[in-house]
């Protein structure tokens, strides 16, 4: 994957527009989770150190395009950046017709989705973005799967279009895990439905040696193998699909599970052998023996890709399976990459972030890359690098 990298460019005195993913949760005007801002800070600092005039843009939430909405304003992000960097970071609302930014200055543009044509990737808007800068830097992996004005269009028209350090690191890590993984490779794919992760399962079945499934996905595989799943969430119409995937790659199945009679925080958890699951049982986690078996598989792996908790870990009594696997990944010498919203929440809960080789910041983009799809914002950077 050949793209120009911001780290290789001379930015002294250049006007640099950086597209970051600063789409963070905000409550009462205050940022409540700063992970994405923290991930973007090194890129912003590096551009400033290189002597650039720095303009940062992002979206936040889903406002009606072309209309200002206070709840989707990036003001809380500007306030956060001002504190984090110890300098005033101005939030600029009117910038499309040009803005004066000096070398060493930093401004944050207001939500790009307030601009008409952003989501449709309108050339007219993209050309206005491009006219603002000498160098456009795409650093928002989380939005790389969307062809929008500030992620794709601007890269077509900017004098120079490059990948930022965060995006470059993400692409390198994903390439390492998927293009030529050290073997044996294990993948953990969990979630409520096979249908939503079918392309991921199919794609991984051709590169990994062990495909560990969890959640509702595992229930469909259990049913495909003829095991009882009680009243658990599963997809009867995808049983044949599960059989076809299991014929291509080793899919180790649970030997024991944690069940309950209801889906609730107060539900009583009972460990049962898989054959003993009753008609009114709901499977909400893998059992301790299964967790130990899966941990053993992870121990002998050289590459691990993790997407999704294997149980309802938000309720502690159904979190042991995810906790054991999280610790096994942390203790493993394998190159490990994790991604997807719930996965990140599990990593936080069990305190293993420092031990995972790479944590992906992109939810949808992470999955689309794993599926083998082309990410438009990356494809345009590759095109520009060739030219």
From Swiss-Prot:
Membrane-crossing residue ranges in chain numbering: none
HAMAP family: Phosphoglyc_kinase
Protein name as catalogued: Phosphoglycerate kinase
Pathway where this protein functions: Carbohydrate degradation; glycolysis; pyruvate from D-glyceraldehyde 3-phosphate: step 2/5
Phylogenetic classification of the source organism: Bacteria, Pseudomonadati, Pseudomonadota, Gammaproteobacteria, Pseudomonadales
Gene Ontology process terms (BP): gluconeogenesis; glycolytic process
GO MF annotation terms: ADP binding; ATP binding; phosphoglycerate kinase activity
Organism in which the protein naturally occurs: Pseudomonas putida (strain W619)
Main location: cytoplasm
Catalysis performed (reactions): (2R)-3-phosphoglycerate + ATP = (2R)-3-phospho-glyceroyl phosphate + ADP
Cell location: Cytoplasm
PROSITE patterns xrefs: PGLYCERATE_KINASE
Similarity annotation: Belongs to the phosphoglycerate kinase family.
Binding site for ATP: 197, 314, 340-343
Keywords from the UniProt entry: ATP-binding, Cytoplasm, Glycolysis, Kinase, Nucleotide-binding, Transferase
UniProt cross-references to Gene3D superfamilies, sorted A to Z: Phosphoglycerate kinase, N-terminal domain
Gene: pgk
EC number: 2.7.2.3
Residues the record lists as binding substrate: 21-23, 36, 59-62, 113, 146
Assembly and oligomerization: Monomer.
Keyword Kinase: yes
One cellular component term from this protein's GO annotations in UniProt: cytosol
């Amino acid at each position: 994957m050949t793209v120009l990298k911001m780290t290789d460019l001379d930015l002294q005195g250049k006007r640099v527009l950086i597209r970051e993913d600063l789409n963070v949760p905000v409550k009462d005007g205050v940022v409540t989770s700063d992970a994405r801002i923290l991930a973007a800070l090194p890129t912003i600092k590096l551009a400033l150190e290189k002597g650039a005039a720095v303009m940062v843009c992002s979206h936040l939430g889903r406002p009606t395009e072309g209309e200002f909405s206070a709840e989707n304003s990036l003001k809380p992000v500007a306030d956060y950046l001002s504190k984090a960097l110890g300098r005033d970071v101005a939030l600029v609302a009117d910038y499309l017709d040009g803005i004066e930014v000096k070398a060493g200055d930093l401004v944050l543009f207001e939500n790009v989705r307030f601009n008409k044509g952003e989501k449709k990737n309108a050339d007219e808007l993209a050309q206005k973005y491009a006219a603002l800068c000498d160098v456009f830097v795409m650093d928002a992996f989380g939005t790389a799967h969307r062809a929008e004005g500030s992620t794709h269009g601007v890269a077509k028209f900017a004098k120079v279009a490059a990948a930022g350090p965060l995006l470059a690191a993400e692409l390198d890590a994903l390439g390492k895990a998927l293009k030529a993984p050290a073997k044996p490779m294990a993948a953990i794919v969990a979630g409520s439905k096979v249908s939503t992760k079918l392309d991921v399962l199919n794609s991984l079945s051709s590169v990994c040696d062990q495909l560990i499934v969890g959640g509702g996905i595992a229930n469909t595989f259990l049913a495909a193998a003829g095991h009882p799943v009680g009243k658990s969430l599963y997809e009867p119409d995808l049983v044949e699909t599960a059989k076809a995937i299991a014929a291509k790659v080793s899919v180790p199945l649970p030997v024991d599970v944690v069940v309950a009679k209801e889906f609730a925080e107060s539900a009583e958890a009972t460990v049962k052998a898989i054959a003993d699951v009753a008609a009114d049982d709901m499977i909400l986690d893998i059992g301790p023996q299964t967790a130990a078996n899966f941990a053993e598989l992870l121990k002998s792996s050289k590459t691990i890709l993790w997407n999704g908790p294997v149980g309802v870990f938000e309720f502690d009594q159904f979190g042991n399976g995810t906790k054991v696997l999280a610790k096994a990944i942390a203790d493993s010498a394998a190159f490990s990459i994790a991604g997807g919203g719930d996965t990140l929440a599990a990593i936080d809960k069990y305190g293993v972030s420092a031990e995972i080789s790479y944590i992906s910041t992109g939810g949808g983009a992470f999955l689309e890359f794993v599926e083998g799809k082309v990410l438009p914002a990356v494809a345009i950077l590759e095109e520009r690098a060739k030219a």
